[in-house]
């Protein structure tokens, strides 16, 4: 659902501060059980639901085996970006590789290859993806997410207001409009 939400957030013409995190660790910290993983019936439903949302948004949907992907390496790649725009471009490239192109990104080398395949200069990613500073930033983001009450992904903050889920984007739009009117 994060892939779906991200494609729509990019169209909202607002600054997006991406904060990659280790979602399973966040869920564990706050006592949330990932039921789409632990309940096979719900997992099958979610797969069909994701396909419906992708069709509605007009985006590709050919997911790889999620359990085979290195989510931490993907998160570290985004954190390796030099600018917020680079982070957004890397995020989209990785989401498309995994969710639309069916590619398995099992390690840092696969992640770098996916970034490069989308026409993005991956030299910064190569230099920083496995650095101690990037690993520490991912841990800090994970801790911050749990402290802010995040329990799943996608979670979007507009100011201090938190919205969870791809299906809450209308509320995100409304909050953005409310803040714009108040300014």
Regions found by a protein language model. Give the residues of each.
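Structural alpha/beta surface segment adjacent to cysteine/selenocysteine redox centers
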Residues: 1-101
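C-terminal cap of thioredoxin/glutaredoxin-like
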Residues: 1-19, 93-183
């Amino acid at each position: 659902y994060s892939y779906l939400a991200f494609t729509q957030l990019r169209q909202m013409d607002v600054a997006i501060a991406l904060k990659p995190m280790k979602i399973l660790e966040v869920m564990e910290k706050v006592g949330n059980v990932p039921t789409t993983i632990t309940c096979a019936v719900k997992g099958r439903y979610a797969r069909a639901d994701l396909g419906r949302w992708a069709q509605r948004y007009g985006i590709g949907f050919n997911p790889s085996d999620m359990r085979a992907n290195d989510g931490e390496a993907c998160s570290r790649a985004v954190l390796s970006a030099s600018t917020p725009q680079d982070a957004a471009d890397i995020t989209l490239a990785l989401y498309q590789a995994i969710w639309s192109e069916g590619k398995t990104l099992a390690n840092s080398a696969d992640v770098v290859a996916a970034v490069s395949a989308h026409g993005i200069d991956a030299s910064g990613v190569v230099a920083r993806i496995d650095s101690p500073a990037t690993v520490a930033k991912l841990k800090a983001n994970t801790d911050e997410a749990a402290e802010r009450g995040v329990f799943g992904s996608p979670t979007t903050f507009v100011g201090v207001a938190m919205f969870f889920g791809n299906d809450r984007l209308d509320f995100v739009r409304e909050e953005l409009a409310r803040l714009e009117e108040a300014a």
